[in-house]
Amino acid sequence: MFSPIVSSTLQATAIAAASNVIAQLLEQRSKQQVPTTISAADFLRFVIFTLLTAPPNYLWQHTLERVFPGRKPIDSTKTVLPRYEIREHDELLGEDVLQQEEEFGTKLDWKNTMIKWFVDCMTLGALLNTAAFLILMGIMKGRSPGEIGTALRTDTFPIIYASYKIWPSASIVNFALIPVEKRIVFLSAVGLVWGVFLSLTAAKQ
C-alpha cells in the first residue's frame, strides 16, 4: 500500500491530468477547432508540475493542522493529541485521532480554522503556490529568467485574485461543514475546476 503522501500525490496528479484535458477541449471548442486534439506537451507539463508540487503542499497542510488544530475537545479537561505525537510517521487525522474524537467529542475551533484559512488561501499559501506555478511552467517551456521574472510580476496577483473566487469559500465549507471522511472528495471536485483554470492560464504563458 502506498504511503499517505504518495497516495495524495497520485490522486492530485490524476485530477490535474483530467483538468488539463478538459481545459484543452474547452479552448479548442471556443476556437471552433475541428478535429480536436490533445497537446501531449501541455498535458505532460501540467502532470509534472503537479507531481513536483503536491508533496510540499501535502506537508504544508499537515504543518498547518499541527500548528493550528481544526478541532478541540468539548470537555476542556480532555486533550485530542495530533497524530504526529501519537505515531510519528503516519497520516494526519488517522484512526487514532478519530477514535479520540469519537470517545471525547470535539467541536470546530473557529479561531484556528480562520487562521489556517487566512494563511493558506488568502496570503502565504496562495502566493507560494502561484509563484511555483509560474516558475515551473516557465522553466518547462524554456523561458528565460527575464521572461519568468516578467510573468511573476504581471501574472501573480491576477491569478491569486482569481483563486479568491473559489478557494476561500471552498476552504471554509470544507473545514466547517464537510465530514472528515468526505473532505478529499469535496476538495478533489473543487480542484478539478481550479485545474481547468490553471491549464488555460499555462497555455498562455
Residue ranges and their predicted role:
Residues 33-36, 72-107:
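Intrinsically disordered, low-complexity domain-flanking/linker segments in eukaryotic proteins
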Residues 150-154:
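Short amphipathic alpha-helical coupling elements at transmembrane boundaries
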Residues 31-34, 146-148:
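Membrane-interface helix termini and inter-helical loops of multi-pass transporters
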Residues 2-29, 39-78, 82-83, 109-141, ...:
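Alpha-helical transmembrane segments of eukaryotic organelle membrane transporters
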Residues 95-106, 123, 132, 136-149:
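Charge-biased low-complexity scaffold regions
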